[in-house]
Amino acid sequence: MGPIILSSGGYPVITSTAYERREGTLFAEGVSTVAIADAVGTPAYVYSAGTVRTRYRRLAKAFHGVPHRIHFAMKANANLSILRLLRGLGAGVDIVSGGELFRAREAGFQGSDVVFSGVGKTRREIEDALDAEVALINVESEAELRCIDEVAAARGAIAPVAFRLNPEVTVSTPHAYIRTGEKGNKFGLSREEIGRLLRVLTYLPNVSLRGIGMHLGSQIQDAEALRTALPVLVDAITAARAAGQPIDHMDVGGGLAVPYESGEPEADVEDYAQLVKEAALALGVQVLLEPGRFLVAEAGVLLTRVVYRKESAGTAFVITDAGMSDLIRPSLYDAHHEIEAVQAVERQVVADVVGPICESGDFFAKRREVADVAQGELLAIRTTGAYGYTMASNYNARPRPVEVLVDGDQFAVIAEREQYEDLVRLERTALTWRSA
């Protein structure tokens, strides 16, 4: 597990080495988070560039000795500055929409840096992917494979594809919604379906099968699921080669766990890598990785200010200016995020930490011992660099928060806070009516 420090109240809080206290104040690398909040307001997402670099290099080092490429799953954090940071480290990207393809290109990625995943790619998205000459399109159904062949034929092109295998392996994750490799899941192809598609490929001259991959889910804390699933993937690659397909890579997806609370284990990256490397070397294939959360989650905190304190029917409430529209993970997944006072507070209180949204499900913590902060004080919600801003919304007509990147003793705004005018910018008064 990563380093742990004691909060001002004496309870353990997960941290990357980028977030430490100096004279009682939480710093992001060399910058006071109080100074950041004073400069840009709250709510504010803050990311540590140093943490992203450290995580990427750890993963790359673990896979040293085998041909590999790390494709960042940009659904975790799609800010252009984060993408450019990772591109500079040598990463490619794993995308799941045409919008993400656009963002990847805006961040400077070439088509050859892009792997396109997802179960519901539209015809236009496939057209755009082929026009961009992406490295691979991960196929998840026969209908999709046939659509790719049609689009490629219309362009006189050969589309590079990979099959996404569903190994039908039960995975232990914190929430059912983040399991993707189990039987009956919408993702991927069963072994039987892959066998059938290997025969279908004979009649589809405009697709070229380059690899087979899988993605078991998210927040996988041990290697047992991978140990069970890898032989299924190896068998699928062996069968494809026997059918005459020149498979040159295997994709093991992402899903490496990060700790969200004290005592929660982090994935054993080195053990995970060793299992994959052994299989890859035996097959003579390149390894593709699609980490998202692992690279950016611990890099981020969400700064929020206490608007009011309240007590009702024996329950203490800490009401903040951030809500589920800014960070939906606790409401959607019942996810745990450590919450600490930005400036040292000795007192503790058992309270619900909630937002201003008009929903009972708008909370960050329930009946939890937290710092007994007063109105106007700052809180830091930890491990929010992944699936925070990318899942934010304008619910209750709330502008999305500002994003800030810290690097050493400097910080920069990398996404301006939305303004009220932005909420209606795309809307039009119904003056021109059309007949069906």
Task: List each model region and its residues.
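General structural feature for long, well-ordered alpha-helical segments within catalytic domains
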Residues: 32, 36, 48-51, 55, ...
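A charged N-terminal "starter" segment
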Residues: 1-160, 199, 204-208, 235, ...
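Hydrophobic residues within beta-strands of alpha/beta enzymes
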Residues: 93-94, 114, 137, 212, ...
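Charged (often Lys/Glu-rich) extended helix/loop segments that serve as interaction or gating elements
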Residues: 275, 284-436
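Short acidic, glycine/serine/threonine-rich loops at helix termini
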Residues: 82-83, 106, 126-131, 148-151, ...
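Active-site loop/helix belt of alpha/beta enzymes
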Residues: 3-9, 14, 167-309, 370, ...
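Active-site-proximal loop/turn and secondary-structure-junction residues that shape catalytic pockets
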Residues: 74-78, 99-100, 120-121, 141-143, ...
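Short beta-strand segments
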Residues: 73, 160-166, 213-215, 251-253, ...
